[in-house]
């Protein structure tokens, strides 16, 4: 998988996840024991990930940027690096009290922590570690 392919695939996946957050049939109310859970009343996408309008828009926007960035190798690598940084910051916010909900605007706790951590690692790999060398130039014909 190249950085371009990764940026395109993850971009499409993030756009689909962002759009899925607006489909009522895919949203489940958060569990909790008689409202004692901190999640009580917060919707969850597929029952796992926080889903608010801002949360959905942020992930869809990152996905659209990935799709656009995948048009060139430079754009894909740049997107992977920037998206990786964004996912790292979102992961860190998820473990800090008061930032784990972005002041009540966007849930970043629970399963969102490991999701953002995984996305950070994948983006970092394709942005900094996985080098896509250009295709080899055709060899000149040798004369014998």
What name fits each language-model region?
Residues 1-144:
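Membrane-interface extramembranous regions
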């Amino acid at each position: 998988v190249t950085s371009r392919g990764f940026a395109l695939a993850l971009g499409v996946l993030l756009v689909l996840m962002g759009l899925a957050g607006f489909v009522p049939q895919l949203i489940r109310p958060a569990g909790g024991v008689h409202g004692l859970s901190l999640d009580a009343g917060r919707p969850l996408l597929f029952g796992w990930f926080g889903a608010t309008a801002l949360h959905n828009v942020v992930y869809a926007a990152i996905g659209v940027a990935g799709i656009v960035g995948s048009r060139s190798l430079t754009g894909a690598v740049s997107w992977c690096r920037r998206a990786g940084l964004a996912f790292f910051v979102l992961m860190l916010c998820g473990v800090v009290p008061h930032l784990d909900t972005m002041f009540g605007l966007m849930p970043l706790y629970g399963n969102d922590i490991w999701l953002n951590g995984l996305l950070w690692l994948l983006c970092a790999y394709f942005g900094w570690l996985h080098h896509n060398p250009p295709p080899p130039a055709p060899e000149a014909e040798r004369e014998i």
